[in-house]
């Protein structure tokens, strides 16, 4: 019988429900249970694909092409797994499905309502995923009390009745602030949040109390008393330097063991040795390198969350800690490349639109001409081609037709299959595609094999009409699409300390124990630049 753990949030948003959910899933998987995570997003968008990174953070892309919430990236990294588009349930998906069924007459003339039709659709989607697993962790986005999340909380309440209380548990993540004036942790916000949750028919089985420092015993006792939750199930989750410490914290606090007992699962010791070694190694690193990320969304670091994590994974692999220098591309346009002085490596990440493109190309040129390790991703790959066309081939005015439709040298152009589309959502070249890597290249050395599958999210590509000119000038296209040999996937510059760019997003498949090869190579080159071989 599948066991369900619903994770809800209270008091304020941004407490780390995603990391908590990922950690719970990882700890059950470490006990040998077949485990997966589901994220519920109460917004009306069908998916995350058209959402502004400043509002929602990065759009994470799955193997099957799903454009999803960044929390699914955390799930994949913590559980070392690959999820599907169905693992992200949104209000937009649910309502679209119900309306489509109503139009087809599947409800036999019934009045279609939130209860039971919307809640039934939610439950069916959760159960569809759950069939192949022992434990399913379901994170319900938003904060208890939000109108948007009401149908999902109601569906979760119903599932506890239908599946049996012994098969469904609730974990509520709350905030316990410390008021400087009185110097004590305040539990009243948690009490009121649980009161709100109980008014919806849900009694939490465990409370994860987020705080700046460890939860005091007096606060733990008070939370237990006023929320009807055992003291052992009031979990202290205080701020830590590295999110990968959270599973170890929750394990020490006894949360997974308590939930296993609550759900009638057999007691098992978790295999956390490799994870613990990874965390301890990262904390012990003393040597550092500084890598600049030159982008258009750097004011919100979550816009590039998977890149941050890939650099962290590569830190452990290379025995050196990466310090990130966040640089707004438009600031490079205004202040020049002096903003890049002293860095050991440069990344130009993906993005859309004209803002900051010249600044990004200034950063690319600076890396190319000064032998600074460089990695370009997606739009960064395309702008690397544009920069090379302008400053090496001498093609004045060369550009991508995305930015300049009238450019005399369209070295980056819209893919043919994209030209007649009339909608934005879900229509890009999305998901995992095969990439064929040429022998005797940097890319082949990094990946160690001929064919790799990497995740994509783009509409534009290198114009194949210009490939020969680039290669004659010394640029090497070392990776080619497996589904179209005219589509360039990886470029590199021989003789440079490290200069590589990819049309795909390597960060989406990076894992704590298995860093993405191009990130690992970048950090290795940055370390060599700073400290020598």
UniProtKB/Swiss-Prot annotation:
- Tell me the GO BP annotations in alphabetical order: 'de novo' CTP biosynthetic process; CTP biosynthetic process; pyrimidine nucleobase biosynthetic process
Residues where UTP binds: 13, 186-191, 222
Give the metabolic or biological pathway. Answer: Pyrimidine metabolism; CTP biosynthesis via de novo pathway; CTP from UDP: step 2/2
The residues that hold CTP are: 13, 146-148, 186-191, 222
- Which residues hold Mg(2+)? 71, 139
Which EC number(s) does UniProt give? 6.3.4.2
Annotated control of activity: Allosterically activated by GTP, when glutamine is the substrate; GTP has no effect on the reaction when ammonia is the substrate. The allosteric effector GTP functions by stabilizing the protein conformation that binds the tetrahedral intermediate(s) formed during glutamine hydrolysis. Inhibited by the product CTP, via allosteric rather than competitive inhibition.
Record's Gene3D superfamilies? 3.40.50.880, P-loop containing nucleotide triphosphate hydrolases (3.40.50.300)
Q: Which Pfam families does the entry link to?
A: CTP_synth_N, GATase
- Where does the source fall among the domains of life? Archaea
User: Which parts of the sequence belong to the Glutamine amidotransferase type-1 domain?
Assistant: 290-532
Q: Where does L-glutamine bind?
A: 54, 351, 379-382, 402, 459
What residues make up the catalytic site?
A: 378 (nucleophile), 505, 507
* Gene Ontology molecular function: ATP binding; CTP synthase activity; glutaminase activity; identical protein binding; metal ion binding
Top EC class, one word: ligase
Q: Cross-referenced NCBIfam families, in alphabetical order? A: PRK05380.1, PyrG
> What's this protein's family per the entry?
Belongs to the CTP synthase family.
Q: How does it assemble?
A: Homotetramer.
| Function summary | Catalyzes the ATP-dependent amination of UTP to CTP with either L-glutamine or ammonia as the source of nitrogen. Regulates intracellular CTP levels through interactions with the four ribonucleotide triphosphates.
Q: Indicate what this protein is called per its UniProt record.
A: CTP synthase
Q: Which organism is it from?
A: Thermococcus kodakarensis (strain ATCC BAA-918 / JCM 12380 / KOD1) (Pyrococcus kodakaraensis (strain KOD1))
* Gene transcribed to yield this protein: pyrG
